[in-house]
């Protein structure tokens, strides 16, 4: 879900409602769930704010989104730091590592807030807690990628891909297509 929302957040500058419509339209291609829609709208708003509003505080935004979904991420992060606790104390005890949206998306927001300035540490921490880490990682990567920019992604993660040259061409073509649309 995150790539179309991120792209629409960029293309729909200043129009959160348009971004939300795109997010819900995409979600409804495969799911009809008010719970999923609630979470999709939080992601949509978060990405929109990161992409369109200068100086946004990603940890604060992520904690706010988590709070709206019923998870006190700011308080949990504070407790984890005070007690030198592990991410396993959060994902596995407070939140399930499974794919259920009411557990997995707050987990993503927890990681986005806790590791807001370190893309690599965030993705590694997510991976280490196990469970549905691939899907969480995709969304976490989109949040931190939007916040920190492409330079925050370790170069070895990009150039070390088996089909790096082919993927690089596809990405450049994709970006060029949307750059053309933005230029008129």
Language model regions located:
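Conserved glycine-rich phosphate/nucleotide-binding loop
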Residues: 146-184
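A generic structural signal for well-ordered alpha-helical surface patches
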Residues: 106, 110, 120-124, 137-138, ...
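Amphipathic alpha-helical interface segments
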Residues: 1-115, 123-129, 143
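Phosphate-handling active-site elements
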Residues: 12-18, 117-122, 149-161
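Conserved catalytic/binding loops enriched for acidic/polar residues
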Residues: 134
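Short, small-residue alpha-helix embedded
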Residues: 6, 137-148
């Amino acid at each position: 879900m995150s790539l179309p929302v991120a792209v629409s957040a960029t293309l729909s500058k200043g129009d959160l409602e348009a971004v939300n419509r795109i997010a819900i339209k995409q979600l409804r291609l495969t799911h009809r769930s008010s719970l999923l829609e609630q979470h999709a709208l939080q992601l949509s708003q978060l990405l929109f704010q990161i992409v369109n509003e200068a100086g946004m505080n990603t940890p604060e935004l992520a904690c706010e989104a988590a709070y709206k979904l019923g998870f006190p991420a700011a308080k949990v992060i504070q407790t984890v730091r005070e007690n030198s606790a592990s991410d396993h104390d959060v994902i596995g005890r407070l939140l399930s590592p499974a794919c259920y949206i009411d557990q997995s998306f707050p987990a993503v927001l927890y990681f986005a807030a806790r590791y807001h300035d370190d893309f690599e540490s965030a993705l590694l921490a997510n991976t280490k807690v196990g469970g549905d880490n691939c899907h969480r990682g995709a969304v976490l990567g989109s949040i931190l990628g939007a916040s920190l920019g492409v330079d925050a992604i370790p170069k070895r993660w990009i150039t070390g891909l088996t089909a790096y040259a082919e993927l690089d061409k596809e990405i450049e073509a994709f970006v060029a297509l949307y750059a053309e649309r933005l230029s008129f």
